[in-house]
Amino acid sequence: MAHKKGTGSTRNGRDSNAQRLGVKRFGGEVVKAGYILVRQRGTKFHPGVNVARGGDDTLFATIAGVVTFERYGKNRKRVSVYPLEG
């Protein structure tokens, strides 16, 4: 027999809220300046052409244009925004 009180359910029951990270605008999408492209922790994606990085590593567009995801270097990815022609 157990000589200590089972305290499983009273000591559990906590969880943190989801951080809602991830890609918010995908390749080929047309965006305006200021649109958030990727929410991330660290630099899973690096900022490319016409993309800036916020204080929490969020990537956002600095001009209106089309989003592209590119590989550069051996194992890095970057997000760029190129202006629309026309």
UniProtKB/Swiss-Prot annotation:
**Gene3D superfamilies in the record:** 2.40.50.100
Presence of keyword Ribonucleoprotein: yes
Keyword list (alphabetical) reads: Ribonucleoprotein, Ribosomal protein
Instruction: State the Gene Ontology BP annotations.
Output: translation
Q: Residues annotated as region Disordered?
A: 1-21
Composition bias (Polar residues) maps to 7-19
- GO function terms (MF aspect): structural constituent of ribosome
Q: Which InterPro entries match?
A: Ribosomal_bL27 (IPR001684), Ribosomal_bL27_CS (IPR018261)
Q: Which GO terms describe its cellular component?
A: cytosolic large ribosomal subunit
PROSITE patterns in the cross-refs: RIBOSOMAL_L27
- Family statement: Belongs to the bacterial ribosomal protein bL27 family.
Against NCBIfam families, the record matches this protein to:
L27
Q: What protein am I looking at?
A: Large ribosomal subunit protein bL27
What is the name of the gene encoding this protein?
Answer: rpmA
